[in-house]
Every structure is written in C-alpha cells, then in structure tokens.
Amino acid sequence: LGLTTLSIIDDCIKLIIKENKNFLINKIPLNDTKTYDQLSKGDTVGIFQLESNGMGSVLRQLQPDRFEEIIAVVALFRPGPMDNIPSFCNRKHGREEIKYLHSMLEDVLKETYGIIVYQEQVMQIAQVLSNYSLGEADLLRRAMGKKIQKEMDMQKSRFIEGAVQNNIQKKEASKIFDLVDKFAGYGFNKSHAAAYALIAYQTAYLKANFPHEFLTATLNYSIDRTEKIILLKQEIERLNINFLKPDINFSDPLFSIETNDTFK
C-alpha cells in the first residue's frame, strides 16, 4: 500500500534524528498524553485518516485516551457504522447505559462499549453463543456480507440450534442473529482498522512531540498543492511558529527549519 503519509513519516524521522539519534518510531508509547490531548481537541491538521472536520468533531466528543479507541473511530467513521458514533461516545462517558446483546457477550463487546464494530466480533459472537468453529464463523461472516437469502436461512438455523444448546431461547437467539446480521453488513476488519490507526497515531504523536519536523515534512510533500500549503501555514501560525517568506538569497529548494520557532 503506497501512502504519501509513510514518506512524510520517514522524512520527519530523518529530521528528528539530527538532534535525537536514538529515536525509533516503532518504540513510541501508545499512551502519550500530549498525543491524546491534541486529538481530543480535534487538532488533526496533517493527521492521517483523522484530518476531516467530521472526524475532528468525533474526536472532541469521544476524548480518546487509549489506542483501541483510535482503532474503533477509524472503523466507525464510514457510512452505516457512523450512526453508532453518538452511542459509542456517550457510553464511554457514562451518559448512556452499556448494553450487551447477551450477558455471554460481555467479553466480546466490552472493548467497544457493547457495540459491534468489527467483523471479528461477529465471528466471536457465533463462537461464544452458538458453538461455531473458527471456520464456521468465517463462513457466517462471508454469508452476512453477501446477503444471499438461502445461505442466510441456513446460517440462521445453525446459529439458533447452537444457541439453544447453550440454554438460550429460540426467540432470543433469532433476535440476536437478526441484530448481528444488521451490524455485520458494515462491520470493518479490525486488523485493517488497527493498521490505519497505528499510522494515524504515529502522525499524531510526531505532530504533538516534534511539530517542527512533522510540519516541515508535511509541507514538502504538499509543495504542489496550494490549498494544502495555505492550510498548513495557518496551522503553523496557530502553533505560534514563524513562517518566513521565500528569499532568493537564503531559501532552500524545499521547506526547512530555520530555528526552533521558525520555518522558511
């Protein structure tokens, strides 16, 4: 997957190690307070996957303080699951009761406050409630994605049969299956969400802790995009960093750090 963001991170690291030779991006803490404070303010200009105004609004509502919540936001911020964002935020902050489809599913859904977010959770629900094997659970996930009625009817019968063996009433099992099916239509693969969330967190960490280096690298990869340059210039000024105009006698071909509080 070719992403400009990966090149920005790489160039940012090259700038950082000029002063901090021991810096390793893979060793940064995933519980950095400055990073979460920045995200909770919706300060996401230049941050991978989190830069839109809509995402900034979600982060201000959520006030994330752990990496798992960044993964969930990446998965939820899409048509369909987006409807669950208000409940996700409210449940985190105790403004809404956390409810589970069944008490047996607390371990499966606790991380996401009782809301089905990932395809993997659909598979785990089938395993816990209806004794599906991992292979069977994957077939269920695929069937729910395809919405082929014949397959769905077979899966529903299998799901209810397994649930009854775990002392769950047929009517309740049928209701749970229908609810899971509804969510499964837009469930996101957690491993994909985690990969994107990690890049998002890394860019947020770099901006929070090494703003000069990060913004310099970001500017240089936006050099042919006037609107992006203007946005980044506004962000730099908001952070009280000076932004010098080009000088034919002194400027480099690309943006660079002049001093600790000045770009050129």
Regions found by a protein language model. Give the residues of each.
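Noncatalytic, beta-rich nucleic-acid-contacting surfaces in large DNA/RNA-processing enzymes
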Residues: L1-K264
